[in-house]
């Protein structure tokens, strides 16, 4: 479980600290545009989390989580092919939907693997691992972009989501 949480958190965490720089530098956009793009991601995610939660109940947490991770990975990779700011709006919308699928499924999975006497502790560990992964990603993302460029960072994000997807395929039978 920790591996799944870590790699999926890294996938998104690598983008956060440098995303505005990517938008401004590569699209001659303003920081205002970067803020709007982030808002598109967050609002889309917020709107689609409840329907995604219903899909988790109907089709199962593993399938929906896998779909969300694949969507997040492909969204990360698609930044490489964006050449107009309108492409970024489309990517943020799709990324938001994908993240919306991922999060309720992951939370449902956490509820299943935790037992009642230690549920709070396990959820605390989950949140701590999520935050630690994000902190690590914040430091590493700047170094990666400075030395290897944005494209490499997007490949790394994709790879993190890909590893999470493989983890799901490997462990879904063990935890249910």
Predicted segments with their positions:
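Helix-loop boundary and gating motifs at the non-cytosolic
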Residues: 1-42
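Loop-to-transmembrane helix entry/capping segments in MFS-fold secondary transporters
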Residues: 31-32, 116-126
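Helix-to-loop junctions at the C-terminal end of transmembrane segments
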Residues: 48-60, 145
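Structural signature of the two symmetry-related core transmembrane helices
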Residues: 63-77, 158
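Helix-loop junctions at membrane interfaces in 12-TM secondary transporters
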Residues: 80-91
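Intracellular juxtamembrane helix-capping segments at the cytosolic ends
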Residues: 101-114
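A membrane-interface helix-boundary motif in multi-pass transporters
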Residues: 146-160
């Amino acid at each position: 479980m920790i591996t799944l949480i870590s790699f999926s958190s890294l996938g998104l965490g690598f983008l956060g600290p440098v995303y505005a720089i990517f938008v401004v530098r590569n699209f001659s956009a303003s920081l205002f545009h970067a803020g709007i793009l982030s808002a598109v991601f967050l609002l889309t995610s917020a709107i689609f989390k409840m329907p995604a939660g219903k899909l988790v109940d109907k089709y199962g947490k593993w399938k929906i989580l896998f779909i969300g991770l694949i969507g997040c990975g492909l969204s990360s990779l698609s930044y490489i092919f964006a050449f107009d700011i309108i492409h970024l709006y489309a990517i943020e919308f799709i990324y938001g939907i994908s993240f919306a699928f991922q999060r309720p499924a992951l939370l449902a999975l956490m509820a299943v693997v935790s037992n009642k006497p230690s549920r709070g502790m396990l959820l605390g560990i989950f949140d701590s691992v999520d935050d630690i992964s994000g902190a690590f990603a914040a430091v590493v993302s700047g170094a990666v972009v400075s030395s290897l460029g944005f494209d490499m960072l997007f490949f790394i994000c994709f790879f993190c989501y890909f590893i999470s997807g493989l983890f799901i395929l490997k462990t879904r039978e063990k935890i249910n």
